[in-house]
Regions:
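Helix-adjacent hinge/juxtasegments
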Residues: 60, 64-87, 94
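Short, structured patches in soluble enzyme cores that scaffold and shape functional sites
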Residues: 31-33, 59, 79-81, 149-151
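Beta-strand secondary-structure signal
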Residues: 28, 56, 76, 104, ...
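Short beta-strand segments
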Residues: 24-61
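Charged, gly/pro-rich active-site loop segments
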Residues: 2-6, 82-162
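Short Pro/Gly-enriched beta-strand edge/turn motifs at strand-loop
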Residues: 11-12, 23-28, 127-130
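Extreme N-terminal tail/first-helix region
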Residues: 1-23
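A generic structural signal for nonpolar/aromatic side chains embedded in well-ordered alpha-helices
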Residues: 20-21, 68-69, 123
Length: 162
């Protein structure tokens, strides 16, 4: 991804990126609806293997989000944590601390029952820190979206030194 401003805030350490992925709980999924953007907040799970990031989302078995993914699988996402406003002596010194991950990828709807179980386990591990197992019947009532991330960046803004 190109065009990042404030490159001094970017970092690439995988362990630090994993901390953000574990700490954040909501991912903002950007989709394309014709010539209009459409963004939806979602809970997520992830798998990071050798620097490759795969995101899993779950939701209803029908709806606008799924229709848009079927029409155009290109997606963009953002997630963040450590959001804390800070004050300054003048207006331009006010700001907010954060840590974020943004990525672009291709979304697909998972049909395989075993992969759906795996995805739901990953989602619950990310959201709760606990391990869960899922029966086949549980996979039938949700749709799993898998995002194969093509590229991602991470960025943070610490609080200013006083």
């Amino acid at each position: 991804m190109n065009g990042m401003t404030r490159r001094e805030r970017q970092f690439t350490d995988i362990q630090e990126i994993i901390k953000i992925l574990n700490k954040s709980k909501v991912l903002h999924l950007g989709l394309v609806d014709g010539d209009e953007p459409y963004v939806v907040p979602m809970n997520y799970g992830y798998i990071m293997e050798d620097g490759k990031l795969t995101i899993y989302l779950h939701g209803a078995n029908r709806g606008r989000k799924l229709d848009l993914i079927r029409a155009n699988p290109k997606v963009f996402y953002e997630l963040d944590c450590d959001i804390v406003p800070f004050e300054g002596d003048i207006a331009c010194e006010y700001g907010i601390t954060y840590a974020s991950v943004m990525g672009r990828g291709l979304a697909e709807i998972v049909e395989d029952t075993e992969e759906k179980k795996f995805a739901l386990s990953a989602l619950m591990k990310t959201q709760t820190g606990k391990d869960f197992e899922f029966e086949e019947k549980m996979t039938k009532i949700v749709t799993i979206i898998k995002i194969n991330t093509l590229e991602y960046t991470a960025k943070h803004r610490p609080a200013p030194k006083k």
